[in-house]
């Protein structure tokens, strides 16, 4: 396995960890199972790839780094672009009035924080479709929970806590 895929798999495991933590904190708001996968152009799971292919469009859309799909009779999933998983660097979610304006360099986010933010954003779409007021309420709720978990240090030893609780 190339080092690029090692990085991508590490980022995917971090995103899955974010889902597991939020699922534990909000058991009724999130699904029991969700697949978090690296986006591939001709993926059978990704409905955006199917839709683009059906419409004759090329999968060259630069406007997104991740998207949430909940296809009929299938497990919901989040597809995240491979280059974003390899080098996580982007501007966090902004309200509509700030979109389209150039973001200053200090508003960019890199590393674990942007992976957490992107995962929280896509998980919020399970509860609310679109980017209205209700979406931002749930988005900020999930994001503040994750910030609290990271700042408290619980995020970094969360798997060991889960492992200990199953042994008892």
Spans of model-derived segments:
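Active-site-proximal or metal-binding-adjacent scaffold patches in catalytic folds
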Residues: 1-117, 126-168
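Walker B catalytic acidic pair
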Residues: 122
């Amino acid at each position: 396995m190339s080092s690029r895929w090692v990085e991508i798999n590490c980022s995917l495991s971090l995103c899955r960890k974010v889902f597991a933590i939020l699922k534990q904190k909000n058991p009724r708001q999130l699904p029991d199972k969700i697949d978090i996968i690296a986006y591939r152009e001709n993926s059978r799971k990704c409905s955006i790839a199917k839709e683009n292919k059906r419409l004759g469009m090329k999968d060259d859309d630069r406007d997104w780094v991740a998207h949430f799909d909940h296809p009929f009779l299938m497990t919901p999933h989040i597809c995240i672009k491979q280059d974003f998983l390899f080098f996580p660097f982007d501007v966090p979610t902004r309200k509509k009035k700030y979109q389209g304006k150039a973001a200053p360099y200090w508003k960019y986010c890199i590393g674990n924080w942007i992976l957490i933010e992107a995962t929280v954003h896509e998980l919020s779409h399970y509860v609310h479709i679109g980017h209205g007021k209700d979406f931002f309420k749930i988005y900020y709720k999930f994001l503040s929970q994750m910030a609290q978990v990271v700042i408290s240090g619980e995020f970094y030893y969360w798997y060991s806590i889960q492992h200990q609780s199953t042994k008892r």
